[in-house]
């Protein structure tokens, strides 16, 4: 954020910690800075800060990549579970702390089972990212209550640290409590990352790659989205700061055109997030998936985005990610009630 301070322009570079009607609190290297909103001249998005030396797509924390993913899949109902926010609500004030546990609810999508990703569960989840300012057991109970009150099947998203089998600090606090509360973990989902410059050279499409802003009914059908969930799911699809729907089109000998693959690529925090990548069974191992990855990476490059992430919920998709040259970054589990 660039703002005026005592008549001079100055910059505050960092993560927004709090927002009030009059100020932003930004975590900078020199400590928290309160920036008057009426003094802001301009602002722009920056990628997550590196945590160690290395390749750009490998040096961000798992927590930051979870924030990137959340920014591209944002339901209408979102809240940060933090003791300070609860205190603000008791005083009749708007919550202002943007840390702790991220709560998301999109109840119409709770029953959607997406084979290509965990997106429906993520939209109805509690994501522990930091200290909620209260005992973990209390935070878990409040998160479950918040989700159930909104008609969402509660999921608790836990994850490892980057390039490690160890759980993240926040996940370490909540994971031991889950089974006692009747939660069971999903199979692990592997988060992959890669530089867009390399993916952009992966494969030229044999057919046509068509871009659009919104999914067609056929997209919802191949993604397994029932009619009753499509309105809310459409909001999720378009919730990223920027996104594109990609369709791979094949032309038959008689000139008939058929969609043989589809994907969604979304952009936030100088990252591309590839999801909903599906290929028609008759077109697998024909390069359709690789062509969609290439097209996504080229769209990212055109926006100055240098890194891409992709989540693989099973061995087949993990093998595909490896074949594209992607690297494993961290793993995610969705804990859900055992009765679900």
Residue ranges and their predicted role:
Residues 88-102, 167-180, 242-261:
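Conserved beta-hairpin
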Residues 1-8:
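Short boundary/loop segments of OB/S1/cold-shock single-stranded nucleic-acid-binding domains
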Residues 202-276:
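Flexible, substrate/cofactor-facing loop regions flanked by secondary structure
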